[in-house]
Amino acid sequence: MRRAAPPARARSSAVPQPDAGRASIEAPDLNEQAEWLLRRNWRAGRLADGTPYGFTCPSPPRYRHQWYWDSCFHAIVWRHFDPARAREELRTLLRAGRLDGFIPHTVFWHDRAGWRRAPFYATQSVRHNLATAHIQTPLLALAWELVAESSPDEPSFATEAVDQLCLHYDWLESERDPDGDGLISIIHPDESGLDDSPKYDEVFGWMRHYLPGYFWLVERSRRLGYDSRAIIGRYDEHVEDVLVNVFYALALRSLARLSGRDRYRERADRTEQALVERCWDERAGMFWDLAGRYERPISVSTWSSLAPLALPSLPEEIGRRIVEEQVLDSRRFATPFGIPSVSLEEPSFRAGWHLFRCWRGPTWVNTGWLLIPAMRRLGYTHESERILASYLELVARHGFREYYNPLNGEGLAARHFGWSTLLVDLVLDRSRLGPCGPSGSSGTSNRVAAS
C-alpha cells in the first residue's frame, strides 16, 4: 500500500534533539569499533597473474566485492587509523581500471558473482568477468587527495597516479558528457549508488532496479558493447544526476590541486555553473536531475537534491534556502534520526526496511558526511551538531548498520557496514568545513553566480 504524504504541519527550523537519557557513544569507543569493523572486512591477496589487491568489503558475506564509492569512503576513514591501508584501498581500485581511463563500478577480486546474481551485473558477458562495465559516482580524486593529506610518511602518494586519475576524469567527460554541458550522465540507476531511488521510477519505468525489465536494461547495454555515447544518443533511459555531478565537481577540484592543471579547475567551474543554471528550481528551492535526451527535470525530492550544499562555490542564498526550507523543515528532511534519503512529503517515502527499497526513505551515514560540513560552513553550527548527535545515537543503539529508520532510529539491513564508519571522519575532524580537504578549500575557483 502506498504511504500517503503526511499532513501539513507548521514549518519548523529545529532539528529534533535526541533524548538526554538515550545511549551515547564516546569518540574513543567509536574509533575502536570503526577500526575493528574495517579490519574485519579487509580482504587481500593476488590474482593468478600476480596482481595484488587489498580492499574493504562493505559487509560480507552479502557485500563481499569491491565497490567504487564504498572503497573511496572506506579509504577516507582508514586514513585515520592506517594510512597505508587507505592508500592500498585506492590503488586497488585504480588497478581495476582500463588503459583508457574507465574504472568499474564493482570488482570481483577474490570471489566472482554467484550464478543467480551474475546475469544482473552490468558485465560484458554473463559469467567470468573480473569487473562490471559501468561506472559509479566518481569521487576517487577527492578520496585520493584526502588520503594524501594523511600520508606524511609517503608524500609521493599525492602525485604517483596523477596521469591515471586524469585519464579517468577525461574518460568521463568524453563518454558521459556527449552534449558538452559539463554534466555527466548515468545510464543505469545503480551507477549513482542510489539504485532504487524513487527519482528513477518514471525514467526507467519497467526497467528500473529489481523489476523484471532490469535484466533487459543490462542486456541492451551488453549488445551495444557498453558504448556510452551510443546508449545516450539512442535511448531516453539516462540521467544527468545531481549527486553524481556534485561529487564529479568536487573530485575535479581535487584533481586540479593534485595535478596542478588548470583545465580541471575550469571543468569543475563549468559543472558547478551547469548545476545552478540547469538543475536549480527557484520556485521549488531544489535541484532536480535531468532525464533523457530532452533533459526533463525529475521533480522528486530526495537527498540528491540537497547535495549541491557541499559545493563551496554555491551561492550562499541558495545554500541557506536548502538548509532552512528543506534540511531543517520537519515536513521534509528534519527527522529525529539523521537526514532521510527521501523527503517525508513524497508519496514514495518509506522509513523502514524492504529488500528492494533501501533508498526510498531510510537514513544513510554518507548523507550526513556530505551535508553536515556544508551546514557548518554556512554557520548552522548548532543545528549540524544536533544532526551529528542523532547519527551517533544510531550507532550507539544499533552499531554500524547499512541504514536506519529516520523516524524511530531502528537499525536496518546489513550489519558491520563499512561506510557507516564515516562518522569517525566527522567526529575526528569537526573543523572540516567541506569534503574538499581540511579547510573545505575549493582551490582558485570562482563563486558560481545564481541564475
Each model region followed by its residue ranges:
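Aromatic- and histidine-enriched alpha-helix N-cap/loop-to-helix transition segments
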Residues: 65-73, 81, 131-139, 160, ...
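Long, repeat-rich segments with strong aromatic
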Residues: 237-259, 264-267, 271-274, 313, ...
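Short glycine/serine- and small hydrophobic-enriched flexible loop segments
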Residues: 76-79, 141-150, 250-260, 310-313, ...
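Alpha-helical support elements that line or immediately flank enzyme active sites
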Residues: 70-101, 304-315, 368-381, 388-391
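Internal, well-ordered domain-core segments that constitute the primary functional module
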Residues: 136-191
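Compositionally biased, low-complexity flexible segments
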Residues: 1-11
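Alpha-helical scaffold segments in carbohydrate-active enzymes
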Residues: 36-37, 92-99, 146, 164-178, ...
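Extended glycan-interaction surfaces of carbohydrate-active proteins
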Residues: 16-66, 90-130, 181-239, 272-363, ...
